[in-house]
Amino acid sequence: LISETAEMCPNSPYAASKVAADRICYSYFRSFGLDVTIVRPFNVYGERQKSGLYGALIPILVGKALRGESLTVFGAGEATRDFSHVSDIVRGYNLVLNSDKLKGKAINFASGVNTSIKDIAEYIAKKFHVSVIHTPARPGEVMRFPADISFARSLGYSPRVGIWEGIDRYIEWAKSNRY
């Protein structure tokens, strides 16, 4: 599990940019005493999220499925992620805003459950009767990215929306918004 104190070893420029932002925020706390809390939401998805060239996995897959296209999975799809519904992340941010115990600390917000990319693609494909195709794995792909949310739980955080319910909510939103 990836805790708030785990060493950060980014495998891609995108991941490195996130680590850099994290460390810049922390440096303002250390250097100037700013009231900074570093919030680390894991793989957020949900209603109103757009797909597109740089979109997130679930909106991209649902968008393709709505158009009747095959869903593309890189590699075997065995990589797992800790997907977090936006409503759970909003509750996490509210926790941070209303806590006086987090100055200078990092906190993970996630579901606490890892789901494979393949399982998500197959779930969406089945709902829309489209196929899943596999292409070569992307360079630098992280195979597992499980969040340790025990610190957040100790402060009262409790994710409520499971991955399948969250995907269903997103699908309904996408359909009703002609997305």
Predicted features and spans:
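Short, hinge-like loop/turn segments at secondary-structure boundaries
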Residues: G55-L57, F151
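Active-site phosphate/pyrophosphate- and oxyanion-stabilizing loops and adjacent acidic/basic residues
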Residues: Y26, P59, E122
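C-terminal substrate-binding subdomain of Rossmann-fold SDR/epimerase-dehydratase oxidoreductases
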Residues: G63-Y179
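Glycine-rich "substrate-gating" loop/helix at the edge of Rossmann-like oxidoreductase active sites
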Residues: N11-Y14, F42-Y54, G75-S87, V113
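Catalytic helix-loop patch of NAD(P)-dependent Rossmann-fold dehydrogenases
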Residues: L1-I38, K50-L53
